[in-house]
UniProtKB/Swiss-Prot annotation:
Its main location: cytoplasm. It catalyses: tRNA(Leu) + L-leucine + ATP = L-leucyl-tRNA(Leu) + AMP + diphosphate. GO terms for molecular function: aminoacyl-tRNA deacylase activity; ATP binding; leucine-tRNA ligase activity. Belongs to the class-I aminoacyl-tRNA synthetase family. It comes from Xanthomonas euvesicatoria pv. vesicatoria (strain 85-10). A motif ('HIGH' region) lies at residues 46-56. This is Leucine--tRNA ligase.
Length: 880
């Protein structure tokens, strides 16, 4: 029985007691049970940064609510937890704190595990792992060597950000205004050998698979479709001439708009293209530009925002139809890693080419017009002013200035050109994808070692499986200049597995997306000798995956791809890793600041600010508690370290209790929307928890309740019982189908309020109240499990795991009403209400509605033309 003092809600004591019971009974450990339907629910695993933030709390509470609800509805539920433990932040922390990344990471895991446990999540901790341990990453090393042998992993040069001072590769986020974040050195673009996985071999399957993911948000599927970027077009060959007219290797370009081919006035190539390097040998000015472009961005997003720059190479390309020679230009918006590194430039019908041509005075030719212009602007074409219709393929177009192709529409031109080029061997139809192969090499220390050995005689050799894992040394001194494994000859130097000669290990490590691409499957069989075992096919695919929409493309794309690799390796049977995806919104909070001496802003944590609000709760002013002086109000933004507007979950748990924090995080907004943190709202949830606690103890203190006898209930007792079962029905739907936890909580609060007004101390009155209180405790259990655990005992039901108690079912007979209240409208305007028997006839309802005193007053002098009855809701009298 609960030892908590009646009428005093002590969250810490309640929560400690419940958690001790769950731990002692291993309440949430599961195995494969064919007698129950399985439900595999998880959140995206956290990076062990050192402390939970409110985004974590919201994410994991959503998963926990669904998991606990599913247990109560008879499912065999797996909810695991682990740690995405490799990555750049550990290296940065190691530099700052002068400690090894491993030591920092493992200490953070210990701390964050304790934080998670304090929130009472129903996690099977027996399946916990950290992705930085050899027991975990040995399996992805083994998989990689198998992919190498199948040709799905390969090595080629790729462009990276290079810091010449620190002698290291930088992630895009480590480049600030073109300089290294730590050294301040001007960052260069450098080509280095890197390993790739052929995700492009799966592009069409990844695209088609989205049509089967009915449980994924449309927004995520749209982002993935756009990222895969399937397009149908022609690959066309342009012969190339050197400055002296000598032939060079031809260019092949891909275009989805072959109808604009006669508008090509130049060809653009990437700065790293072999033809650009060839031309630069005899052109110092061009060579200088190529050197400058080394310092530019390496991503499509960066290139889109950069000022467009370029230079003529002196080379020319031969137009494949007209035979005219057009100049070849280097352009900084062409990526060597995208397509062929060359594009045919049609400035008349491509905005990027249009801007470039206008900047450098290149010809611009119109070769397409609208067949049915909508206005005068669409009838005119201006080579100095861009209009969107110039490139609108969705409109009906007609070719002009295109020789024998004049008058054709897009489809006709596509077919005519495709037939011509295929017949002459100058081109072919092609399906192209925006998706690029996945570069998995990272020039960092704190990651999974890539299991490859380099031999002067044998080349790149996969590490034999009996020599795996290649273990990353953890006890290192990390300065941030270079990688400890690069500078450690005892680790780096080895022998070739094929010839036995001297060789060296690969010193790059895997992209950390590798670890997070298969961990969901590993939870199903965490002690398996291979990557997974037969248990994976019991649990996979996961039934619900909860995480932020910011992971819609990279993580979730690689996640789907890697699962298909595992399927093709016969490790899993399913095509997709997750059936349903829930993308929760951000946690946001108010921001406050003072102007800094350097012109910036000093951001102040909301906990250090006293806020003034108007009667509607809006912030009208704020002062710093320390000095009483005003601070600026910066608006509401995502909680972040940079804006210093985060709220420490541990401080909230210490102040209010885990259940109250969980309750607020589920009540403040629907899961998919942003949640604004508001401590006044947390106070409100704390008051509700105390009120519920008192309601239960007050009821129990008045003595035991007799058995409920529905045959003798009064009208008021029936009304409360009906409210109870209406609430059960709504909350069941909100939990199970809609994931609308805020409305579920609101419904329970309404029932609590109705019960507070129910002043009936009779035996059956108390029986009705007992049923309602038991229902409330069970309905709230997925969200407030500690308090529910205690209150269930107070209600005389004993100490048990509530997840094994069946979720309440609405009694259909309790929902039947003896009488109904209907709104009475006159010509659509509310004029009164009437109470009618549930089985009243239409004639009786019409008579009562017209006799309602206020309605009768408005009907004076009017004739009733029609009476519309919406059953159970409205009577609308149409009169004139």
């Amino acid at each position: 029985m609960s030892t908590v003092e009646p009428n005093v809600y002590d969250p810490q004591q309640v929560e400690t007691s419940a958690q001790q019971f769950w731990d002692a009974t291993r309440a949430f450990q599961v195995d494969e049970n064919s007698e129950k339907p399985k439900f595999y629910c998880l959140s995206m695993l956290p990076y062990p940064s050192g402390a939970l933030h409110m985004g974590h709390v919201r994410n994991y509470t959503i998963s926990d609510v669904v998991s606990r609800y599913k247990r109560m509805t008879g499912h065999n539920v797996l909810q695991p937890m682990g740690w995405d433990a490799f990555g750049l932040p550990a290296e940065n922390a190691a530099i700052k704190n002068k400690t090894a990344p491993a030591k920092w990471t493992y200490a953070n895991i210990e701390h964050m595990r304790a934080q998670l446990k304090s929130l009472g999540y129903a996690i099977d901790w027996s399946r916990e792992f950290a992705t930085c341990t050899p027991d975990y990453y040995v399996h992805e090393q083994r998989m990689f060597t198998r992919l190498m042998r199948k040709g799905l992993a390969y090595r080629r040069n790729a462009v990276v950000n290079w810091d010449p001072i620190d002698q290291t590769v930088l992630a895009n986020e480590q480049v600030i205004d073109g300089r290294g974040w730590r050294s301040g050195a001007l960052v260069e673009k450098r080509e280095i050998p890197q390993w790739f996985l052929r995700i492009t071999d799966y592009a069409q399957e990844l695209l088609d698979g989205l049509d089967q993911l009915d449980g994924w948000p449309d927004s995520v599927k749209t982002m993935q479709r756009n990222w895969i970027g399937r397009s149908e077009g022609l690959e066309i060959q342009f012969d190339v001439r050197d400055i002296d007219g000598a032939p060079l290797d031809p260019l092949r370009v891909f275009t989805t708009r072959p109808d604009t081919l006669m508008g090509v006035t130049f060809v653009s190539i990437a700065a790293e293209h072999p033809l650009a390097l060839h031309a630069a040998k005899s052109n110092p000015e061009l060579a200088a530009l190529l050197e400058t472009l080394k310092h530019g961005g390496v991503s499509e997003a960066e290139l889109e925002t950069q000022e467009k720059r370029g230079m003529a190479t002196g080379l020319t390309a031969v137009h494949p139809i007209s035979g005219e020679q057009v100049p070849v230009w280097v352009a900084n918006f062409v990526l060597m890693g995208y397509g062929t590194g060359a594009v045919m430039a049609v400035p008349g019908h491509d905005q990027r080419d249009f801007e470039f041509a206008n900047k450098y005075g290149l010809p611009i030719v119109q070769v397409v017009k609208l067949r049915e212009p909508r206005n005068e602007e669409e009838q005119t074409w201006d080579a100095t002013h861009w209009r969107d219709w110039y490139t609108d393929k969705s409109r009906e177009l007609e070719l002009i200035n295109s020789a024998e192709f004049d008058g054709l529409d897009f489809g006709g031109a596509f077919e005519a050109l495709a037939e011509r080029f295929e017949r002459k061997g100058q081109g072919q139809r092609r399906v192209n994808y925006r998706l690029r192969d996945w570069g998995v090499s990272r020039q960092r220390y704190w990651g999974c070692p890539i299991p490859v050995i380099y031999c002067a005689k044998c080349g790149a050799v996969p590490v034999p499986e009996d020599q795996l894992p290649v273990v990353l040394p953890e006890n290192v001194e990390f300065s941030g200049t270079g990688s400890p494994i690069k500078t450690d000859p005892t680790w780096r130097q080895t022998t070739c597995p094929d010839c036995g000669g001297p060789a060296e290990r690969e010193t790059d490590t895997f992209d950390t997306f590798m670890e997070s691409s298969w961990y969901v499957a590993r939870y199903t069989s965490p002690n398996a000798r291979d990557m997974v075992d037969r248990r994976a096919n019991y649990w996979m695919p996961a039934d619900l995956y909860v995480g932020g929409i910011e992971h819609a493309i990279l993580h979730l794309m690689y996640f789907r791809f890697y699962h298909k690799l595992m399927r093709d390796a016969r490790l899993v049977d399913s095509d997709e890793p997750v059936t349903n995806l829930l993308t929760q919104g951000m946690v946001i909070a108010e921001t406050f600041y003072r102007d800094a001496d350097n012109g910036g802003k000093d951001w102040i944590n909301p906990a250090d600010v006293e806020i003034q609000r108007d009667e509607r709760g809006r912030v009208t002013g704020a002062v710093l508690i320390a000095d009483g002086q005003p601070v600026h109000i910066g608006g509401t933004e995502k909680m972040s370290k940079s804006k210093n507007n985060g709220v420490d979950p541990q401080s909230m748990v210490a102040k209010y209790g885990a259940d109250t924090v969980r309750l607020f995080s589920m009540f403040a907004a629907p899961p998919e929307q942003s949640l604004e943190w508001n401590e006044a709202g947390v106070d409100g949830m704390a008051r509700f928890m105390r009120r519920l606690w008192v309601q239960v103890h007050k009821h129990v203190g008045e003595g035991a309740a007799v058995a409920l006898d529905v045959a003798v209930l009064s009208a008021e007792q029936k009304a409360i019982r009906r409210k109870t079962h209406e609430t059960i029905g709504k909350v069941s739907d909100d939990y199970g189908r809609r994931h609308s936890f805020n409305t579920a909580i609101a419904a329970v609060m309404e029932l609590s309020n109705a019960l507070a007004k129910f002043d009936d101390a009779s035996e059956q009155g108390r029986a009705v109240r007992q049923e309602a209180l038991e229902a409330m405790v069970l309905l709230l259990n997925p969200i407030t499990p500690h308090a529910s655990h205690a209150l269930w005992q107070v209600l005389g039901r004993g100490e048990t795991l509530l997840e094994n108690v069946a979720f309440p079912q609405a009694d259909a007979s309790a929902l039947v009403r003896d009488a109904l209240t209907l709104a009475v409208q006159i010509n659509g305007k509310l004029r009164g209400t009437i109470d009618v028997a549930a089985d009243a006839t239409r004639e009786q309802i019409e008579a009562l509605a017209q006799a309602e005193p206020n309605a009768a007053k408005f009907l004076e002098g009017l004739s009733v033309r029609k009476i519309i009855i919406v059953p159970g809701k409205i009577v609308n009298i149409v009169a004139g």
